[in-house]
Curated annotation (Swiss-Prot):
It comes from Escherichia coli (strain K12). The keyword Transmembrane applies. This is Protein TrbF. Keywords: Cell inner membrane, Cell membrane, Conjugation, Membrane, Plasmid, Transmembrane, Transmembrane helix. It is a multi-pass membrane protein. It is found in: Cell inner membrane. The keyword Magnesium does not apply. GO terms for cellular component: plasma membrane. The chain crosses the membrane at residues 31-54, 71-98.
């Protein structure tokens, strides 16, 4: 088992597999970011066109006057939510490879433990 850990070919294959996985995942995040950004822009444009077309009839009827305020809020609330999702996926797109690199870099550093392995912790089951 010890020979496998020090085998350079296995390390190269493992690193190559990790690199392909990271590339695939970051590609998905970039795609989702683009999808949400496009959806936000298209939705805002369509809602703005509908608002401009219907505002005259809403102002004429006093009962529909409140719906113009609600529609005006929705014009901005929904697309900004999509923009926030796009920004989140974009940040994830840039941060995932860096996090993976740091995990890979510091994987061999042992964590500091307050007790020796195999030793019972005080207050635990004996």
């Amino acid at each position: 088992m010890r020979e496998n850990k020090s085998n350079p070919e296995l390390k190269i294959r493992s690193t190559e597999r990790d690199y392909k996985y990271i590339s695939r995942i970051t590609g998905r995040y970039a795609g989702l970011s683009l999808v949400f950004l496009t959806a936000g822009i298209v939705l805002w444009t369509v809602m703005d066109i509908i608002f401009d077309a219907c505002i005259d009839s809403w102002k004429a009827d006093p009962e529909l006057n409140n719906s113009s305020y609600m529609w005006n809020i929705l014009i901005y609330a929904i697309p900004y939510t999509l923009y926030a999702l796009a920004a989140g996926f974009l940040v994830t797109f840039f941060s995932v490879p860096n996090v993976r690199i740091n995990i890979r870099k510091y994987r061999d550093i042992p964590a500091e433990m307050s007790y020796a392995p195999g030793e019972h912790i005080k207050g635990g089951q004996e």
